[in-house]
Amino acid sequence: MRIIGFRATLAVALGAMACSQQVDSTDVRTSGVYADMSVYASGNGKSEVQVDLRVGGSSSNTHLEIKGADKLTATVGTVTKALSKSGNIYVTTFDGDAADTQFILAFTRGPDDTSAPNSSVTLPEPFAISGIAQTVSRQVGFTATWQAGTKGEPMTWVLRGDCLVAQAGSISDAGQTVIPAGKPVAVLGQEQATCNASFCLERDRSGILDPAFGEGGVISAAQSRCAAFLSAP
């Protein structure tokens, strides 16, 4: 899935390396579909819905192409939008990224199959990252702070840069984390380089998937934020 959340960036990279194929949705029963549904908010006042329907489970590279009477829609409040195709997935965007905004995702089928009209998820609380200087020495490290959430939801971090070895991990939603001296590691041969870098955090929340998807799946929403800086020796 494409970037808003940085997990999506990794998925795009992995998808590019793997062979994929598509099958018409009208050739597959809902009971044989695995659903991967996400909502991402990156702090720009919008939320992007991404849906990837696959045949063969979570590790499959066979994606459904919506055909015939089948359709994918997303609803927020009184606004319903159809998802449009983007590569192997389907996407749409809504204005707004407030905490607890509910998204209802529907896979509506033709008369010969079972619809899955009620997968739902709400956005976690938004936040902002602070505490990172404009230039950070790799021999010093930094402390990143943010507004801790009220629900103890899982968070992940990613540190990356033009001259850095990319790193990622999971942390508690405590409002602060330390990237110690020496943890930002330069790519071999670029130990003395200064480069553009970013530290990103993502707060995640799971939703409820419509049980009609016989192969199961996941539905989640994330608030993702990044802080840019210069990484120096």
Annotate each language-model stretch with its function.
Residues 15-18:
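C-terminal motif of bacterial Sec signal peptides marking the signal peptidase cleavage site
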Residues 1-9:
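Bacterial N-terminal signal peptides that target proteins for export
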Residues 20-100:
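Solvent-exposed N-terminal domain segments of exported/luminal and surface proteins
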Residues 89-96, 175-189:
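Exposed aromatic-hydrophobic patches
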Residues 97-113, 190-209:
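Short, aromatic- and glycine-rich surface loops/edge beta-strands on solvent-exposed regions
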Residues 84-142:
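Surface-exposed loop/turn and intrinsically disordered segments
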Residues 118-127, 209-233:
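Short beta-strand elements
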Residues 128-181:
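Short helix-loop boundary/capping segments
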